[in-house]
């Protein structure tokens, strides 16, 4: 019975700051695993550690343009959100995935400088 209930509880995907704040507000003990996508064994290890040590765990997927020397490299960065989500949804007890847009991360910033 517990197994069936655990399968029915799925991770929630959050797409903006407003929903992120509203969703996380009730929780005090939250583990956070930031990524630029390309979910791999290292990420999965960090996520599992967070799940063990925190009441709730959130993974972010955000390709940060500030981490690239030029816009061309940023535009060529291989992003595959569907693949990342298919990997993440297999991780039991992962609560949330946050996939912000540029303006959610860099609010009030007129220009990004490297």
Labelled PLM ranges:
Residues 2-114:
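Nucleotidyltransferase catalytic core that binds NTPs
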């Amino acid at each position: 019975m517990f197994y069936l209930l655990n399968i029915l509880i799925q991770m929630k995907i959050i797409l903006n700051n407003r929903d992120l704040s509203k969703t996380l507000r009730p929780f005090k003990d939250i583990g956070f695993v930031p990524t630029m996508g390309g979910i791999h064994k290292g990420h999965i290890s960090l996520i599992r550690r967070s799940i063990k040590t925190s009441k709730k765990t959130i993974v972010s997927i955000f390709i940060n343009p500030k981490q690239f020397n030029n816009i061309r490299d940023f535009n060529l960065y291989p992003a595959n959100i569907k693949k990342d989500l298919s990997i993440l949804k297999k991780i039991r007890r992962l609560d949330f995935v946050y996939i912000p847009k540029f303006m959610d991360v860099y609010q009030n910033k007129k220009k990004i400088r490297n």
